[in-house]
Amino acid sequence: MAVRLLFPTYVFHRNFLDPNLDESQGYDLEYAEMLVNEVDEMRKRDPMGRNVSNSTSPTENYQAGWQSNDGCESNAIFQKCMNRISRFFQDEVLPFHGIHDSSGMRMKAGNSWANINEKGSFNRPHTHNGCWYSGVLYLKADGDEGCFVATDTDQKVLSMFPHHQRVKGDMVFQPKTGDIHLFPSGLLHMVEPNYTDKSRYSISFNMDMESVINNQDGKGNFGQDFSDPNYDSEEFVFNLDERGNPIR
């Protein structure tokens, strides 16, 4: 007996503090602390920030955290960070989607903003319009300041069913310092309330891809068909053992 996965959602993960990454793929804790300090300075320069998905509990007298306006991608202190994000996308996401020769293609954060989630603050369910992939990078997080929750909006069952981890409507991530998640922009997601006395720092971003053809910026061949004639259509088919678990 076998099971086939239909229409999976692809979420890519890396931790930029991983010591196994080379210098062009990650960074050290000292740089992470530098980013946190810069976010604090950004807040001093713009204490109001903006309210988009960031919210506060209606039953508690808490602030809604703080979200900057766009612009991290043009901040000199964030350039190393932005380069690492682009490299991650080039290394992992593009090859997975069949783009093995990315020469002439330039990945960058089209817009990026900083977040400080304080006690009681959370982010309402939302998607990111106008891009292919979005992401979040955690600059300072211990894992207990509110989970990142992705929600499956594709109805798979319309009646009663046995509860099991394989039939669930959401996936929960407990972010730690250095974690980065890249996800399709249409993935519905939210951030649970922070019930600790700590503040979590992160930056969110929307990825933009451009082709550079004859030194002219444009979408170029990004819209072309990258289908692989040798693609294995059975890659998401798994045989099951006697307990119903996939054999990998």
Question: Could you say what each language-model-derived stretch is?
Answer:
Residues L188-S202:
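Ligand-binding loop in jelly-roll beta-barrel domains
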Residues M1-D101, F122, N221-F226, N230, ...:
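Non-heme Fe(II)/2-oxoglutarate
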Residues G104-M105:
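Histidine-dependent nucleotide/RNA phosphoesterase domain, centered on the 2H-phosphoesterase fold
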Residues V149, M207-R248:
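Double-stranded beta-helix
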Residues K108-L182, E192, M209-N221:
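Catalytic core of non-heme Fe(II) oxygenases with the double-stranded beta-helix
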Residues H13, V136, S204:
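Short aromatic/hydrophobic contact patches that present stacked aromatics
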